[in-house]
UniProtKB/Swiss-Prot annotation:
Protein name: Uncharacterized HTH-type transcriptional regulator R00410
Gene3D superfamilies: lambda repressor-like DNA-binding domains (1.10.260.40)
Database matches in InterPro entries: Cro/C1-type_HTH (IPR001387), Lambda_DNA-bd_dom_sf (IPR010982)
Any one GO molecular function term: DNA binding
Taxonomic source organism: Rhizobium meliloti (strain 1021)
Domain HTH cro/C1-type stretches: 19-73
């Protein structure tokens, strides 16, 4: 039973990863989020890794600072299977987007892409990425 105390709960890990995702989407540092909450960046790290649980009132504060509803942190949570959530294709697609935006490259690509205002340039960039992906698949 001692092992369970040292192993983070999957829900805590998920909530932490969603905090990290939203924080990085906003370009906010752990230090800045910690300052806004009156805690250290180390505590933010522990929340994001799921090693420390985020209390309800703290999660409410985090949601206000990151400008998302509290429910955002529980979207696609483990054990949240089924009947009332989005369809399987939607959940799969949602997880793919979360994984993409959780990576450093994905976040950089997203930030750069949204700065491109010309729709023709955006379309050409999407076509280029699709061509590169198709080439990589055929190898």
């Amino acid at each position: 039973m001692i092992e369970n105390k040292k192993k983070p709960n999957p829900i805590d890990i998920h909530v932490g990863s969603r905090i990290r995702l939203r924080r990085t989407m906003l370009g906010m540092s752990q230090e800045k989020l910690g300052e806004s909450l009156g805690i250290t960046f180390q505590q933010i790290q522990k929340y994001e890794k799921g090693t420390n649980r985020v209390g309800a009132s703290r999660l409410q504060n985090i949601s206000q600072i990151l400008n998302v509803p509290v429910s955002f942190f529980f979207e696609d949570a483990p054990g949240d299977g089924g009947g009332t959530g989005p369809g399987m294709a939607e959940a799969s697609s949602s997880n793919y987007v979360v994984d993409f935006l959780s990576s450093s490259e994905g976040l950089q690509l997203n930030r750069a892409f949204v700065k491109i205002s010309d729709p023709k340039v955006r379309r050409k960039l999407v076509d280029l990425v699709k061509a590169l992906a198709a080439e990589a698949e055929s190898e």
